From Swiss-Prot:
Cited Gene3D superfamilies: Divalent-metal-dependent TIM barrel enzymes
Gene this protein is translated from: xylA
Protein name: Xylose isomerase
Any GO BP: D-xylose metabolic process
Subcellular location(s) per record: Cytoplasm
PROSITE patterns linked to this entry: XYLOSE_ISOMERASE
Catalytic reaction annotation: alpha-D-xylose = alpha-D-xylulofuranose
Main location (coarse class): cytoplasm
Cofactor section: Mg(2+)
Subunit structure: Homotetramer.
SUPFAM superfamilies: Xylose isomerase-like
Organism listed in the record: Cereibacter sphaeroides (strain ATCC 17029 / ATH 2.4.9) (Rhodobacter sphaeroides)
Coiled-coil ranges per UniProt: none
Family indicated by similarity: Belongs to the xylose isomerase family.
Length: 433
């Protein structure tokens, strides 16, 4: 036991009438919604990097947090893990996520970093034995160190490609050893700053081959989890190749991986790409590649990825409605890729940020489930496209342009526009949130 969270009680559900800030008002893990426990719907995960590794810096200032585990030794990494599991237990969090660089100190060589990772993974595995918290996904940090400044899989230097591939192998091994449900790849440096020094064809082909190797290794070691890519349009790169859901799907199709890889979609990244969160979720679901989500929000005025905790439940309800329509999570879940503000220095701030985020998502899920169970929105959607269920419409899809023209002339087809009824549906939505 550490004393970092001393005096903070285990968070329990007390209902909407509770005035206890260290309690859930909406998140009741055992509440059954649409035939499944709320905990199983939401599958919350705590992000190791923002919660325990982030020093509180921003582009204009450095560290504001003074955590007792900050440092570059294995003993401090183990202390960080001990503190992390204490918070997982306080929250009753079912899952966590990590990058390799979050949990182990960087070594002077690849071999030393590999040994450090293996040792800390053993320590985390021991902590997991006494906790309900499991691993939602692991990943490799292929963007922070200066060696990755020109990319990892897309780097012009083959040695960086090699280092990156070896790093991913080790992280996949660690994820499998800890029983992870997924493995994520995020290409923060897989992009370019200027076309003047960039070979787009080579970089795309190398990225595709890299991903094929990842999938091959997954099958070789018998990893039963899902491989996920996380789209983001820019930041830190000027232009990233995994721009959004549509772009990544095209990439997967190009390299024959659309049946092997799904997506981890982040709210903040969707906004940066000029989309709504629900758009990206709905599109991924329609393409069969919706895997998991990173839950956060951006400051809509700042123009960059602020990774704040969610607090707008009507907005989140739109997202969870699309997840419910898609059948819910299988191996995926709701990872809080969110960080407290750099002025929020206290241990209580870290816990309460997660309490608020979990309550916001639970409230959103309940609203989405009520509307989904009511069926009115789906009925309106079906009615709008009902004409396509007729034999004539189905026959038209199997015919040719010449045959369709002949039918239009013969039947004198002259369609009149029909209302999309958007305002009615928005009013319907508001009744449930």
């Amino acid at each position: 036991m550490t004393d970092f969270f001393a005096g903070i009680p285990q968070i329990r559900y007390e209902g909407e009438g509770s005035s206890n800030e260290f309690a859930f008002r909406h998140y009741n893990p055992d509440e059954v919604i649409l035939g499944k426990r709320m905990e199983e719907h939401l599958r919350f995960a705590v992000a190791w990097w923002h919660s325990f590794a982030w020093p509180g810096g921003d582009p204009f200032g450095g560290q504001t947090f003074n955590r007792p585990w900050f440092g570059d030794t294995l003993d401090l990494a183990k202390l960080k893990a001990d503190v992390a599991f204490e918070m997982f237990d306080i929250l009753g969090a079912p899952f966590f996520c990590f990058h390799d660089a979050d949990i182990r100190p960087e070594g002077a060589t690849f071999a030393e970093s590999k040994r450090n990772l293996e040792e800390i993974v053993d320590h985390i595995g021991t902590r997991m034995e006494g906790s309900k918290t499991k691993l939602l996904w692991g990943t490799a940090n292929l963007f922070s160190h200066r060696r990755f400044m020109s990319g990892a899989a897309t780097n012009p230097d083959p040695d960086v490609f090699a280092w990156s591939a070896a790093t991913v192998k080790g992280c996949m091994d660690a994820t499998m050893k800890l029983g992870g449900a997924n493995y994520v790849l995020w290409g923060g440096r897989e992009g370019y700053e200027t076309l003047l020094n960039t070979d787009l064809t080579r970089e795309a082909e190398n990225a595709g081959r890299f991903l094929q190797m990842v999938v091959d290794y997954k099958h070789k070691i018998g990893f039963q989890g899902t491989i996920l890519i996380e789209p983001k349009p820019q930041e830190p790169s000027k232009h990233q190749y995994d721009y959004d859901v549509a772009t990544v799907y095209g990439f997967l199709k190009r390299f024959g991986l659309e049946k092997e890889v799904k997506l981890n979609i982040e709210q903040g990244h969707a906004i940066l790409a000029g989309h709504s969160f629900e758009h990206e979720l709905a599109l991924a679901a329609s393409l069969g590649i919706l895997g998991s989500i990173d839950m956060n929000r951006n400051d809509y005025q700042s123009g960059w990825d602020t990774d704040q905790f969610p607090h707008n439940h009507p907005e989140m309800a739109l997202a969870y409605y699309e997840i419910l329509r898609a059948g819910g999570f299988t191996t995926g879940g709701t990872n809080f890729d969110a960080k407290i503000r750099r002025q929020s220095l206290d241990p209580e701030d870290l816990v309460l940020a997660h309490v608020g985020g979990m309550d916001t998502c639970a409230r959103a899920l309940k609203a989405a489930a009520r509307l989904y169970e009511d069926g009115s929105l789906e009925a309106a959607r079906a009615a709008r496209y009902a004409g396509w269920e007729t034999p004539e419409a189905q026959a038209m899809l199997a015919s040719s342009l010449e045959e369709i023209e002949a039918r239009v002339l013969a039947e004198g087809i002259n369609p009149e526009p029909r209302s999309g009824r958007q305002e009615r549906l928005e009013n319907l939505w508001n009744r449930f949130v």
